[in-house]
A protein has these predicted regions:
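A short acidic/glycine-rich loop-to-helix N-cap element
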Residues: 110-114, 142-148
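Solvent-exposed loop/turn segments at secondary-structure junctions
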Residues: 57-59, 104-106, 138-142
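Short, low-complexity N-terminal intrinsically disordered segments enriched in polar/charged residues
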Residues: 1-48, 144-152
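A short, structured loop/turn motif at beta-sheet edges
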Residues: 89-97, 111, 123-130
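A solvent-exposed, acidic/Ser-Thr-rich amphipathic alpha-helical stretch
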Residues: 36-95, 113
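Hydrophobic/aromatic beta-strand elements that line small-molecule binding cavities or substrate pockets
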Residues: 66, 70, 84-90, 102-105, ...
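Short, well-ordered beta-strand segments in beta-rich or mixed alpha/beta enzyme
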Residues: 46, 51-55, 96-107, 120-122
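Short beta-strand edge/turn micro-motifs at domain boundaries
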Residues: 1-3, 116-143
């Protein structure tokens, strides 16, 4: 039984590292998406029929629609940083993985990181690698409100 537990633990660690590295790559391209080549590379991480649910922005039903919003509202305006210690990865048997955590958004012009939100992504494992099929971005709030809640 301990061999199985060790194998499962190793598989979980490999999955965590894989998805964490992919998340970092997705958002490295997102953070540089004012460059059209980086926006296209960012696009490659998402399924054509990706569904993106945003608590304040609504729903998009395709990669093209999502990218149009990214180009219009995000590229050159702000970047994303994952909040250390919040990232989690869970396997989805026979499909892929679910990742979740908290991220902050930083204004490009001022370098101020005043927005926080929670996220969940569904990753599908395919022969050619991994692709994101669903994104939930929710709980958008100001970073100062979040730190005030954490204070005694």
């Amino acid at each position: 039984a301990s061999d199985l537990a060790g194998q499962a633990g190793n598989e979980a660690a490999v999955l965590f590292t894989t998805i964490s590295d992919l998340d970092a790559a997705v958002f490295d391209d997102f953070n540089h998406c004012a460059d059209p080549a980086r926006l296209q590379r960012h696009a490659g991480y998402f399924a054509e029929d990706v569904e993106f649910y945003h608590d304040t922005g609504g729903v998009t039903w395709s990669r093209d629609e999502m990218l149009a919003n990214t180009a219009k509202y995000a590229c050159g305006n702000y970047g994303r940083e994952r909040v250390e210690g919040t990232f989690q990865v869970h396997p989805i048997k026979g499909f892929g993985a679910l990742s979740l955590g908290t991220h902050r958004f930083c204004q490009t012009a001022t370098d101020s990181c005043d927005g926080l939100a929670d996220f969940t992504m569904i990753w599908k494992r395919q022969d050619a690698g991994w692709v994101i099929t669903r994104v939930l971005s929710y709980g958008h709030r100001s970073a100062s409100a979040d730190s005030a809640e954490a204070s005694p």
